[in-house]
Amino acid sequence: VELRSPAKPTSTLVVLLAATGEEGFWLRRRFSNPLLARGFATLSLENAFYGVRRPRGQRVSLLRTVRDQFAMNVATVQEARAIARWARDAGYDRVCLTGFSQGGLMASFAAALTPFAVAACPRGAGDAAAPIFTNAALSRRIHWARLSAELGSESRARRYFEDCLKPVRISRFPAPELAKAAILIGLRGDGFIPAAEVDALHRHWQGAELRWLTTSHVIAAAFHSAAHQRAISDSLSRLPG
C-alpha cells in the first residue's frame, strides 16, 4: 500500500483501488495530488497478482487463469474492507472507497459489504462482471482458443465463462449502509462497461447519485480526473459528522 497525507492533519481518507492491469502507484499518485490539496489523505492498494505481488511465473499484469482472476477480486474486496476498518480505528472519521473500472467494481463490493457508513465512488463500473468479460471490449483479452480447446467450442467456452461470472453481481448484496453517500460515474461512450449495468447498479443503490460523462473509458481515465475528484469530494461531504 501507499499512504499519502496532506500537510495538515486530517480525519478523511480516500482508498484508491487499481484499475485492470494497473501496477504500481504512479497513476494513482498523480490522481491523488488534488485530493491531498483538498485536505484528504489517500491510500492506494497494490492488487494481489499485480506488481510486487505477482506470483512466480506470471509475466506482466496478465492473469494466467480464471481462478487467478477470482482470487484477485476476492482478495481486493476483503483487503479494502480491512483497510476501511483499520482507517476507522486509526481515527479517520470519513472514508471513501473508490476506483476506476475494475477498481470501481471492487470498491462497490467493498462498500456494500462494509458494516458501517463509508462514502463510495465507483467510476466507470457497473453492476455485473459477466458482460464486461463476455460481450464488451475486455473480452478480447481472454484466451478463448485455450478455453475452447478445453470445452469443445468457443460458444461453449463463452457460455461456461458467463455462467461462472453470473454470481459476480453487486445487486446480490444489500446497498451500502448509507447509499446517499455514494456517487456513481457512468460513461456514455464506454466500450468496456455497458450503460445498462451502470443503470442497474444505480437502481439497486437507492439514494445514490449517478453522474454521466460523455466520453470513452480510456479518455475518462486520462482526461477527466477533475470530474472524478469532485465526485469523491462530494460523496465524502454526504457522510455524517
Which residue stretches match the model-derived regions?
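Hydrolase active-site cap/lid region
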Residues: 109-157, 212
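Proline/glycine-enriched tight loop/beta-turn segments at coil->beta junctions
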Residues: 5-13
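Gly/Ala-rich beta-loop-alpha elbow adjacent to hydrolase catalytic centers
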Residues: 98-107
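Cap/lid segment of the alpha/beta-hydrolase catalytic domain
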Residues: 15-74
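Active-site signature of alpha/beta-hydrolase-fold catalytic machinery across serine-
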Residues: 30, 109-113, 200
